[in-house]
Regions:
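Short, functionally critical alpha-helical segments immediately adjacent to catalytic or ligand/cofactor-binding
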Residues: 43, 50-67, 102-107, 123-130, ...
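Bacterial flagellar/type III secretion structural subunits and associated motility module proteins
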Residues: 27-31, 35-37, 41, 49, ...
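Substrate-binding/active-site groove segments that recognize
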Residues: 71-92, 101-109, 125, 129-140, ...
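Cell-wall glycan
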Residues: 80, 131, 145-172
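A short, acidic/glycine-rich surface segment
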Residues: 67-70, 147
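Cell-wall glycan-active module
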Residues: 1-58, 171-172
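Amphipathic alpha-helical polymerization modules
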Residues: 40, 44, 50, 96, ...
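Solvent-exposed, acidic/flexible segments
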Residues: 31-39, 48-49, 53, 72-76, ...
Length: 172
């Protein structure tokens, strides 16, 4: 039976930071389940904007691992990783507030779904890389997007598949 003493268990900040970094990059499955206090916020935003709950949860899981206090290296904040300018345009005054962040992030996701005719991969690419970048590709369907995916940043290419994988675990 394995019974380590306290001296053999690492608690260094670098080890914790490394795991956190891997989780944030999506290289380790966080196994995240939706904190119950977010469930009603997600259900409300889903009903308000017509975005499936499973997609909202998948974006949150991919973006922040359900950590409302996370900040990306680019400065995106909160559960759905809103940039300050985008957040302000969506009426979000505090991106760390889960209610505001989920409402604003879902509204933004809904706008991308509308802009790109309900094409989920295109909307996700726009959510991650910006709608202008996706529009500049001159494609009008997810199938066409996939044929020119290499023209998007590698982060965005990976983002689409990460969200789709996460969504499958949140579907009922």
């Amino acid at each position: 039976m394995y019974n380590p003493d306290a001296s053999s268990v690492s608690t260094s900040n670098s080890d914790v930071g490394s795991l956190s970094s891997l989780l944030n990059k999506g290289l380790v499955d966080s196994g995240a389940s939706v904190p119950t206090d977010f469930e009603s916020l997600i259900a409300s935003a889903s009903a308000k904007y017509g975005v499936p709950e499973s997609l909202i949860k998948a974006v949150i899981d991919t973006e922040s691992g359900f950590d409302p206090n996370v900040v990306s290296s680019a400065g995106a904040k909160g559960l759905m990783q809103l940039m300050d300018g985008t957040a302000a345009g969506l009426g979000v005054s505090n991106a760390y507030d889960p209610a505001q962040n989920i409402d604003g992030g879902t509204k933004y996701l809904s706008l991308q779904l509308q802009r790109f005719g309900g094409e989920v991969k295109m909307a996700l690419a726009a959510y991650n890389a910006g709608p202008g970048r996706v529009s500049s590709l001159g494609v009008s369907s997810d199938a066409e997007l996939m044929s020119v995916l290499n023209r998007l940043p590698s982060e965005t290419q990976a983002y689409i598949s990460k969200v789709e994988k996460a969504q499958s675990k949140f579907r009922v």
